[in-house]
């Protein structure tokens, strides 16, 4: 059982009591993202370079803020790129000033000539059936939000590549594949991210030096520009990579993956070398957990699981992450993977955390069910064994997929309505968006009603999938993701975007 250090108690108190950096950071993303996009060289202009220029500008220019007592530095911007701004120019002008922006910079931001000029390809509709059009028209059977193409956030990308190579190593990889595949806006965009990633740590190192935090300065001179050499550098590099990902398209369910597997080699090296204790490791993990809590938006992570050879992947970090979750005693998304052969001591410890924290965490995933379910839909066995969770526990293969986890939504209660109305809408009787399952007055048993409901469910799900697929060809044009592309297997190698 880990006992919180005085440092962690203070940082936890600041986070729980919402003492944050809002006065210093809330306008940083809004200004610097716009600056990067508006000042982009027109000769390099496309949607993917536009998005990269905005994110890279934030990486290069956002103020490096270091709180008292922090071991891990860097910050998210709340839920939304403009979190903290009010929409009222007078009030927001004061916010910009508190963020250190000059009156000339504020005037530039509000100048109507300084607009971001992207372009949008409208989604096609000709491939949808009449019933699918009607289902969408209701907005209650498919995607109540009225947007059938949610292509932002909800990811687990290959953070371990940043830990291993640093952004300088990733830049070398981008340059190598640009030669193989030919130069394009895609590789220009990825270079922008890599080059800015090499600056990000230096900015924090310089700030740390100014305030006498030489320990932070030493770490940030190494990461994220170069590969991590220690557990502390690995945690810091992971956090930098994660906030860059959230700076691309907000926090919402952008998640971290199997942290006990990603960080374990660095932990093991430092423990074996005698330069790290479990107490040190827990304190660093506490700092990471607090960072994730401060701007909480279901940033999921996972411990445990089964390797392809059938062996358990539970390790010492799996236990330490449970210890930290219990000690901090706040809602911090964490999942536990297990199977029939998992050490009962590990399961007991996870269940103790559930009972003591009493906030519904951790979540549990049974590999004996999940892995066969993934292979059954064509995912290779080794990849299936590496599955993890996004946000509200959607399943993903980390660093190897774009799951479109919340791309369209189905209202399955409509299946009951349609079954009771032979496919007609009760909101608009002229519409018949449901399947034709027969007049319910002819149903002679409850089983017949259930069969009709099941048929309507299949109809709604199939239509939802068709609508989502019809939008997907537009995602690359409308919403390219250079950061996620950089850290997703197959994208850089083939010159294709994450979306």
Residue ranges and their predicted role:
Residues 1-190, 210-499:
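Conserved catalytic cores of very large enzyme subunits
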């Amino acid at each position: 059982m880990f006992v919180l250090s005085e440092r962690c108690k203070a940082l936890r108190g600041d986070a729980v009591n919402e003492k944050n950096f809002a006065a210093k950071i809330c306008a940083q993303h809004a200004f610097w993202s716009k600056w990067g996009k508006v000042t982009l060289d027109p000769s390099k202009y496309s949607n993917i370079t536009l998005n990269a220029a905005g994110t890279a500008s934030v990486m290069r220019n956002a103020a490096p803020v270091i709180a008292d007592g922090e071991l891990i530095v860097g910050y998210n911007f709340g839920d939304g790129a403009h979190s903290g701004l009010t929409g009222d120019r007078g009030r927001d002008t004061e916010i910009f000033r508190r963020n250190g922006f000059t009156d000339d910079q504020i005037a530039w931001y509000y100048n109507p000539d300084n607009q971001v000029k992207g372009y949008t390809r409208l989604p096609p509709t000709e491939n949808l059936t009449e019933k699918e059009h009607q289902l969408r028209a209701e907005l209650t059977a498919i995607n109540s939000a009225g947007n059938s193409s949610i292509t932002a956030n909800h990811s687990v990308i290959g953070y371990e590549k940043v830990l291993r190579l640093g952004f300088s190593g990733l830049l070398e990889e981008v340059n190598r594949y640009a030669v193989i595949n030919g130069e394009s806006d895609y590789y220009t965009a990825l270079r922008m991210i890599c080059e800015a990633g090499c600056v990000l740590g230096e900015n924090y190192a310089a700030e740390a030096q100014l305030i006498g935090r030489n320990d932070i300065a030493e770490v940030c001179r190494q990461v994220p520009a170069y590969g991590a050499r220690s557990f502390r550098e690995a945690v810091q590099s992971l956090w930098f990579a994660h906030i860059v990902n959230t700076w691309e398209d907000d926090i919402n369910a952008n998640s971290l993956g199997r942290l006990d597997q990603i960080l374990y080699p660095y932990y093991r090296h430092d423990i074996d070398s005698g330069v790290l204790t479990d107490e040190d490791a827990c304190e660093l993990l506490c700092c990471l957990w607090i960072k994730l809590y401060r701007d909480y938006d279901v940033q999921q992570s996972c411990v445990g699981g089964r390797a392809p050879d059938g062996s358990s992947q539970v390790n010492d970090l799996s236990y330490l992450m449970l210890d930290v979750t219990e000690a901090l005693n706040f809602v911090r998304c964490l999942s536990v993977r297990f199977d029939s052969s998992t050490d009962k001591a590990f399961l007991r410890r996870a269940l103790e955390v559930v009972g003591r924290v009493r906030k519904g965490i951790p979540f549990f995933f049974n590999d004996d069910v999940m892995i066969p379910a993934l292979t059954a839909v064509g995912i290779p066995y080794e990849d299936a064994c590496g599955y993890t969770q996004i946000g509200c526990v959607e399943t993903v293969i980390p660093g190897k997929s774009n799951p479109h986890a919340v791309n369209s939504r189905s209202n399955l209660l409509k299946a009951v309505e349609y079954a009771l109305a032979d496919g007609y809408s009760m909101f608009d009787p002229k519409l018949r968006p449901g399947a034709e399952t027969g007049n319910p007055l002819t149903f002679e048993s409850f089983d017949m009603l259930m069969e009709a409901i099941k048929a309507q469910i299949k109809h709604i799900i199939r239509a939802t999938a068709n609508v989502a697929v019809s939008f997907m060809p537009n995602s690359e044009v409308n919403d390219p993701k250079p950061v996620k592309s950089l850290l997703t297997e197959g994208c850089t190698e083939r010159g294709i975007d994450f979306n």
